[in-house]
Amino acid sequence: MTHVPVLYTQAMEGLRVVENGTYLDGTFGRGGHARGVLQQLGPGGRLLVMDKDPEAIAMAERAFSCDPRVVIRHGSFALLAQLAAPQSLDGVLFDLGVSSPQLDVPERGFSFAKDGPLDMRMDPEMGESAAQWLARVSEREIADVLWTYGEEKQSRRIARAIVAYRANQPLLRTVQLAELIASVMLRTKFGACKSRIHPATRSFQGIRIHVNRELVDLEVGLEAALAALRPGGRLVVISFHSLEDRIVKQFISRHSKVPPTNRRLPEVQTFVPLLRMIGRAIKADEDELEVNPRARSAVLRVAEKLDVLGAVR
């Protein structure tokens, strides 16, 4: 059965694929978006696919290595500037966050519901694993990451518990960490609250984002995408939590809206918009949520590159 990504139809409509265009799928995953783009491309079209995850790249090579329209590169979309010349792309797609295969395979170490090694790296060959990071850093740094990237209100208590636990035995397994966090939450007044999410959800999110430099890569990748898009080209981004969506929303706004001016100062027209927001933020409808509950938090935003005069070519 072919994998259908979250907000697939809306993403394809947002990209507005042209037959001979050149496109980037910066987060290949299982290839659902890439297949959608290729179905609309003619023989003269081109598709660059990227992913941090070597397993995703291996899947891309199995599926598309014989297609002359496809170029496959292993790496973060933050490296886009090294691969695409300025104004060379007609569309860029980023489908952010962790992919279903990463969550569903315990050995990848992303899931608090399935026991596996505490890894969380999208590229297992790059940087520290979550276990290595938690074993090395201070209580304060752990708390800061849980608060900043996980928006976890109990970040200090959880960090304190992690440091106390690791003094006696190493934290090496996902369920080991999840149970420790759950025990901390049960000892607080928040433990009695009924929540739809697991008590370790926010902490796992925060650690994962930090280990993979997700928000740093997003900021760099958005700027690179803007530079690489031709006038009239489309930027389509699907985010899955408020931190990602805030960065995307602010990026589009910063490049599309005239900043406020001081009425007491002489008016000098220096701002030239580079993007035009296309419609409002899009969320999954009830029909999609019935098929894919993971789509509940997804938000899709679309923007269009303008020319230097502020008009679409």
UniProtKB/Swiss-Prot annotation:
The keyword rRNA processing appears for this protein: yes
Classification via Gene3D superfamilies: Putative methyltransferase TM0872, insert domain (1.10.150.170), Vaccinia Virus protein VP39 (3.40.50.150)
Annotated GO CC locations: cytoplasm
Localization per Swiss-Prot or TrEMBL: Cytoplasm
UniProt-listed GO biological process terms: rRNA base methylation
Reaction it catalyzes: cytidine(1402) in 16S rRNA + S-adenosyl-L-methionine = N(4)-methylcytidine(1402) in 16S rRNA + S-adenosyl-L-homocysteine + H(+)
Residues reported in the UniProt entry to bind S-adenosyl-L-methionine: G31, G32, H33, D51, F77, D95, Q102
Enzyme Commission number(s): 2.1.1.199
GO molecular function, one term: rRNA (cytosine-N4-)-methyltransferase activity
InterPro entries: RsmH (IPR002903), SAM-dep_MeTrfase_MraW_recog (IPR023397), SAM-dependent_MTases_sf (IPR029063)
Keywords from the UniProt entry: Cytoplasm, Methyltransferase, rRNA processing, S-adenosyl-L-methionine, Transferase
Any Pfam family the entry gives: Methyltransf_5
UniProt record similarity statement: Belongs to the methyltransferase superfamily. RsmH family.
UniProt function note: Specifically methylates the N4 position of cytidine in position 1402 (C1402) of 16S rRNA.
Protein name: Ribosomal RNA small subunit methyltransferase H
Species this protein is from: Xylella fastidiosa (strain Temecula1 / ATCC 700964)
